[in-house]
């Protein structure tokens, strides 16, 4: 397992437990392991109850954190992938298709970063091209045609900023998705599972409900990008994060996010199954409420929700 800098003391204890577990088991060894286990639990509860916003960002990028493909088979069943935008190509930074959630059909779409070097290159580190956004929109329109709810998983450092992406209409593709998603006639639930950065996240992030995993973030720019603009150096990222209000808890307070999905102690990477179960429960609950509304009622609430963003008050 990989550890972050603020987890060094937890690593020391877990290394000791691992070392002792390989020793011949006797009463003394078992007792020592139990003591260390209790100490580890207390340390973890203390550490994760007072995380800084920057530490939350670090957890959202943890190399062992579950990505969309990891969660797909744990949350849904009977997934059938659909490919291509029917105009240019098949962007592998986004994966989508038909699936079942608790035996009910849904259209699921998610950004995939890739785990190792080969898969990261294959999925372009989760940075979508215009054809990716058009592919996602094609699947959403298909879901609308067959009256299926849509569930999107957001995990990206941003839309791909390359010249070819700009030539193929990156900004138009994202803007088109914002327009079309705001008027879809089926329930739409969006979940930030890691990084939700800039227009790259917004391109599949407009819906009736926006959920976030506990240790994820949602922002118009990365902390490093913000620090580079304000302080001319990315090294100030940890400082600017605190004032950006980009973590799940802060965004829930600001009523940008509808619900925060709890993660296992220590983060989602420590228990994929529990994380997936929490996501499944949260999504199913939201879809149940949304499915009971009429199209007119649901779209009116979606419109009111979107128009409420950007409120301000004088200090």
From Swiss-Prot:
Q: Which Pfam family, just one, is annotated for this protein?
A: ACCA
What catalytic reaction does the record list?
N(6)-carboxybiotinyl-L-lysyl-[protein] + acetyl-CoA = N(6)-biotinyl-L-lysyl-[protein] + malonyl-CoA
**SUPFAM superfamilies, alphabetically?**
ClpP/crotonase
**Entry GO terms, CC:** acetyl-CoA carboxylase complex
- Record's keyword terms, sorted: ATP-binding, Cytoplasm, Fatty acid biosynthesis, Fatty acid metabolism, Lipid biosynthesis, Lipid metabolism, Nucleotide-binding, Transferase
Q: Which InterPro entries match?
A: Acetyl_CoA_COase_a_su, ClpP/crotonase-like_dom_sf, COA_CT_C
Places the protein is found: Cytoplasm
The segment(s) forming the CoA carboxyltransferase C-terminal domain are 36-289
Tell me what this protein is called: Acetyl-coenzyme A carboxylase carboxyl transferase subunit alpha
The record lists the organism as Francisella philomiragia subsp. philomiragia (strain ATCC 25017 / CCUG 19701 / FSC 153 / O#319-036)
């Amino acid at each position: 397992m990989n550890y972050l800098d603020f987890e060094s003391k937890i690593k020391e204890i877990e290394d000791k437990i691992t070392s002792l577990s390989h020793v011949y088991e006797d009463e003394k060894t078992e007792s020592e392991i139990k003591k260390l286990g209790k100490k580890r639990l207390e340390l973890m509860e203390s550490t994760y109850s007072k995380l800084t916003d920057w530490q939350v960002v670090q957890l959202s990028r943890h190399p062992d954190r579950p990505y969309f493909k990891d969660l797909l088979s744990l949350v849904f069943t009977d997934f059938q992938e659909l490919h291509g935008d029917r105009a240019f190509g098949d962007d592998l930074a986004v994966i989508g298709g038909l699936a079942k959630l608790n035996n009910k059909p849904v259209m699921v779409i998610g950004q995939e970063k890739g785990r190792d070097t080969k898969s990261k290159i294959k999925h372009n580190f989760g940075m979508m091209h215009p054809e990716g956004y058009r592919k996602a929109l094609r699947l959403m329109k298909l879901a609308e045609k067959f009256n299926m709810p849509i569930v999107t998983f957001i995990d990206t450092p941003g839309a791909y900023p390359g010249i070819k992406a700009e030539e193929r209409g990156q900004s138009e593709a994202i803007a088109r998705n914002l327009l079309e998603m705001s008027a879809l006639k089926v329930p739409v639930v969006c979940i930030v599972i890691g990084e939700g950065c800039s227009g790259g996240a917004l391109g599949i992030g407009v819906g009736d409900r926006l959920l976030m995993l506990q240790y994820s973030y949602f922002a118009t720019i990365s902390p490093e990008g913000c620090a580079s603009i304000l302080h001319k150096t990315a090294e100030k990222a940890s400082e600017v994060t605190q004032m950006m209000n980009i973590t799940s808890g802060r965004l829930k307070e600001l009523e940008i996010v509808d619900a925060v999905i709890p993660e296992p102690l220590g983060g989602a990477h420590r228990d994929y199954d529990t994380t997936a179960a929490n996501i499944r429960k949260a999504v199913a609950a939201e879809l149940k409420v949304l499915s009971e509304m009429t199209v007119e009622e649901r779209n009116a609430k979606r419109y009111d929700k979107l128009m409420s963003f950007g409120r301000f008050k004088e200090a």
